[in-house]
Design a protein with these regions (language model features):
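Generic hydrophobic, amphipathic alpha-helix propensity
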Residues: 454, 479-482, 486
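Glycine-rich flexible loops
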Residues: 1-445, 450, 457, 461
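Rossmann-fold cofactor-recognition segment
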Residues: 486-498
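Residues at the C-terminal ends
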Residues: 463-464, 488
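Conserved glycine-rich cofactor-binding loop
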Residues: 451-453, 475
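Conserved glycine-rich Rossmann-like NAD(P)H-binding loop of the short-chain dehydrogenase/reductase
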Residues: 467-481
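Glycine- and other small-residue-rich loops at beta-strand/loop junctions that grip anionic moieties
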Residues: 174, 472, 498
């Protein structure tokens, strides 16, 4: 496929840049990863991983040994550096199969990855490490593209994959990532040696190549083909999302409603932990929340594990008319209280029904995603960035539902499978390793008198402790117009109000 033929993904490969990295496969891996991570249509923030296999001099023997460099635990492909990679002895990873005790003992394998580390400066290996290790290809990409997950999450996903790609893409049914899934990928390849990639049901895509460029191009071509197919199917079964049930007010009116409602929603969501909010009325969000199918699809939840880890099991849909009078804050709170109580009860029931004897304690039962039909989507999290990323992930989920419904029927993960991911002990350990909240975490700070002196110093220091900061200096009449300090901007002011 020629570069100009890509319509639904961005071809960013620069031959001149790649030539500068020629001979350094790890540098080319990082370059490829950054290009893939730069396009949110290819993978979500922090999602997916990439790898390459090279021959290195073994510091223990002086001889050559095969080493796999793979994105480590955490981090984002778009900003990946060498420090974010894990380097492991490939033969040691393969030898772990001898001590693998079966799927009931998956979690113990993660600690054993540490015994396979080649580069002592490595990032901690991720749970996806064996998925790369048991495929023989030099360069491998594992991504979560919306267009492909739409097919992977469709009721007829396996048949659609076979039909669309004419047998050149394999299929592995949904399974929680881990050592056994790596063995399943190897088995799929052994049974289908000529395939160019593998779809993981309700999860994502694996593609590969002999070189960094071949892997990159293969990945783009598969995702492009998926997106083009979906685009050709929209509207054939009927209107998208069953057609529009209501029409949104003008953008200015939507923003007014959002500004009026956001503090109340933040109050509900901050019942246990102080939260920061984000609002979007993106066209994709409006198409979904204004549709006839919202009531059916929203409670189903998401499919891709990355999606519900960021957005919770399902959103809260508000039963408020778009033109609701929100000036009386007390009346609004009384009207919304039952909805939040019902959501918390739903989440608690989900936890009680699905928990295991060793499950971590139930986390905050408040919603992360709140949908206001006609107006937009609110997301709440510990800081502004996390709230924004949660919104991105739910838009990913909307894209997946839209595509799956266009070609088949959307299916979400069963609640028990979702719980097993959300309350996975390995996920809990990752949460426990995160830095503790700072003094003003979850709070919104307003600094006055910040154009100079003490106020300016406070304003510059506060972002280290408070995620959202607004600062201003009022000047006497007749002097220069009011100034905002260098750390402030209109977005921060909007965040303060919302």
């Amino acid at each position: 496929m020629k570069t100009q033929e890509f319509k639904y993904v961005s071809y960013l490969w620069d031959d001149a840049k790649a030539a500068e990295l020629a001979g350094d496969e790890v540098a080319l891996l990082i370059y490829r990863s950054n290009l893939l991570g730069a396009d949110l249509r290819l993978t979500n923030y922090g999602g997916g991983n990439t790898s390459c296999k090279v021959s290195e001099k073994d510091p223990l023997t002086g001889g050559e040994t095969d080493v796999m460099w793979v994105k480590g635990s955490g981090g984002d492909l778009g900003t990946l550096k060498k420090s974010g990679l894990a380097a492991l002895y490939l033969d040691r990873l393969h030898s772990l199969e001898k001590v693998y005790r079966g799927i009931a003992h998956e979690d113990e394998m993660v600690e054993l990855f540490n015994h396979c580390i080649f580069d002592l400066a490595s990032k901690a290996p991720s749970i996806d490490t064996p998925l790369h290790a048991f495929l023989p290809f030099k360069h491998i990409d594992h991504l979560h593209p919306d267009a492909l997950i739409a097919i992977a999450a469709a009721k007829d996903g396996k048949a659609l994959t076979l039909s669309l790609f004419k047998g050149t893409i394999g299929w592995v049914e949904w399974q929680r990532p881990g050592f056994d899934l790596g063995l399943k990928l190897r088995q799929c390849l052994q049974e289908n040696p000529d395939i160019r990639g593998i779809v993981l049901g309700s999860h994502g895509l694996f593609t590969w190549g002999d070189t960094a460029y071949e892997s990159y191009l293969n990945t783009l071509e598969v995702i492009e083909q998926s997106a083009a197919y979906l685009e050709s199917q929209y509207g054939k079964k009927g209107p998208v999302f069953g057609g529009q049930k209501l029409t949104s007010p003008a953008e200015e009116d939507r923003k007014k409603q959002a500004i009026a409602l956001a503090p109340t929603l933040r109050g509900f969501c901050s019942e246990k932990t102080r939260m920061i909010g984000h609002f979007t009325d993106d066209a994709r969000v409006l198409e979904f929340i204004n549709s006839n199918d919202l009531e059916r699809l929203a409670p189903m939840g998401t499919s891709c594990p990355d999606h519900f880890l960021r957005t919770k099991i399902s959103p809260l849909v508000l039963e408020l008319p778009p033109g609701e009078d929100l000036n009386d804050n007390k009346a609004t709170k009384e009207k919304l209280a039952p909805a939040f109580e019902a959501y918390r009860a739903m989440y608690a029931a989900y936890y009680e029904q699905c928990k295991h004897p060793d499950s971590p304690a139930m986390r905050d039962a408040n919603p992360v995603v709140i949908l206001y039909p006609g107006i937009g989507m609110f997301t709440f999290a510990k800081d502004k960035q996390t709230a924004r990323v949660a919104a991105e992930f739910y838009i990913n989920a909307i894209n997946v539902m839209k595509g799956a419904e266009a070609v088949s029927e959307y299916t979400s993960l069963p609640r028990q499978e979702a719980f097993n991911i959300e309350y996975w002990l390995l996920e809990e350990a990752k949460l426990q390793r995160m830095p503790k909240p700072k003094a003003l975490s979850g709070r919104i700070a307003l600094v006055t008198g910040s154009a100079g002196g003490i106020g300016k110093a406070i304003a510059k220091n506060s972002p280290m402790k408070a995620p959202v900061l607004s600062s201003t200096t009022m000047m006497p009449a007749g002097l220069n117009r009011p100034k905002m300090s260098s750390v402030s901007n209109t977005a921060a002011i909007r965040s303060h109000r919302c």
